[in-house]
Amino acid sequence: MNNILITSAGRRVSLVRFFQKELKSVFAEAKVFTTDANPDYASACRISDGYFKMQRVTEPNYIDDLLQLAIKNDVKIIVPTIDTELLILSKNIEVFKSKGIEVVISDYEIMKIFRDKRLTHQFFEKYGINCAKEYSKENYQLPIYIKPYDGSRSVDNFIITTQEQLTDYHFQNDKLLFLEYLDHKKHTEFTIDLYYDKNSDLKCFVPRQRIEVRDGEVNKAVTKDAFFIPEIWKKMQHIDGFRGCITFQVFVNLDTQQIFGIEINPRFGGGYPLSY
């Protein structure tokens, strides 16, 4: 049986339904299963073909338990959905592959890059994509944007426009980066869904203009045929180690049309239903 398992499904109802529709069009008897720490209260679990309570990814037996669950339920593909799963699952790709199970995820070395925004900026520079300037805490130019190099969901993010807004916390917290501020009034924000095959070749490209964001995740957006598609496609048409869905966030300057890379999340994003 060619079943699929979507981990940490949470509220991703549309994602589960899309996988059900596409999977059953090929394998009519196949099922889409889900896991969650609290599956009885996870809407995506309730509409899946079966769900399982799974310990948190930080628990020592997480990989072993997930592997046994997949084997027991004839799962051939695992689809992770949250940032905290990515490193450990990518590190264990071969463990699952040895049992005939594919984890839809990029290589471990790729995951390490995108868990650190400093390395992400280096990635952008390598592929000829502009990004916000990084300032030292001794030499910066207001306004600045402050965020942790390993953060997510907009936690500990600050827009600083005056010197008085800066505190000891900003200077003493080694995780906080001082960055050039890209004013939302002067830029349009896009998230691009990039889809890579097993050979790390780009197969599909869908840009979405972000209209409303909640806790760092898109809440409202519209799919658009953007002018920058050929440029980004050319620069990112093959990235060694990329597989599956990659969500790429960019700002586009309204006056100059200059593109700035903001961050990359190597997983299905919250706005995926607009790409489907």
Model-predicted regions and their roles:
Residues F248:
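Catalytic phosphate/metal-binding cores of nucleic-acid and nucleotide-processing enzymes, i.e., regions
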Residues P39, D150, P266:
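Short, glycine/acidic-enriched loop or turn micro-motifs at the edges of active sites
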Residues S154, I211-A221, N265-S275:
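Glycine-rich phosphate/pyrophosphate-binding beta-alpha loops
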Residues M1-V104:
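ATP-binding N-terminal substructure of ATP-dependent carboxylate-amine bond-forming enzymes
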Residues D40-A42, L86, E109-I113, V213:
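Short gly/pro/ser/thr-enriched loop/turn and capping motifs at secondary-structure boundaries
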Residues I160-D240, F251-F260:
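Phosphate-binding site of ATP-dependent enzymes
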Residues Y108-T188, Y196-D201, A226:
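Active-site nucleotide/adenylate-binding loops and adjacent lid/helix of ATP-dependent enzymes
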Residues A28, I47, D74, N130, ...:
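Short loop/turn motifs at secondary-structure junctions
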